[in-house]
A protein has these predicted regions:
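Aspartic protease
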Residues: 1-6, 10-102
Length: 102
């Protein structure tokens, strides 16, 4: 399932479409997209491993960066923590816990 959402920054409001993933334990955003939006990007103190759906380690990538953003879906606004990585064509993945909280 996908959902349309807005990212609020000091300078602008950007529209994006996110994939809602019932198996995701965290929120993710495409690092290239975050750089394109000129979002604040922060390094993680310790890089984190990424695991595939079958619970094997993803050897092509690890999490090194994050950003904290204000986002809006419909009339609901929230502050979310996104880990930044390569998501291919996807702009963002919203976790199951986010979905249940809205």
């Amino acid at each position: 399932m996908t959902i349309r959402f807005y990212i609020h920054t000091i300078a602008k409001r950007a529209k994006a479409i996110a994939l809602v993933d019932s198996g995701a334990t965290e929120n993710f955003m495409n690092l290239t997209y975050a750089r394109w939006l000129r979002l604040p990007i922060h390094p993680l103190e310790q890089p984190r491993k990424i695991f595939n759906v079958n619970r094997t380690e993803n050897k092509s990538s690890e999490l090194k960066y994050y950003t904290d953003l204000k986002v809006q879906t419909g009339t609901t606004r929230s502050s979310l923590h996104f880990f930044l990585t390569n998501l291919g064509e996807n702009k963002a993945i919203l976790s199951y816990s986010w979905f249940m909280a809205t």
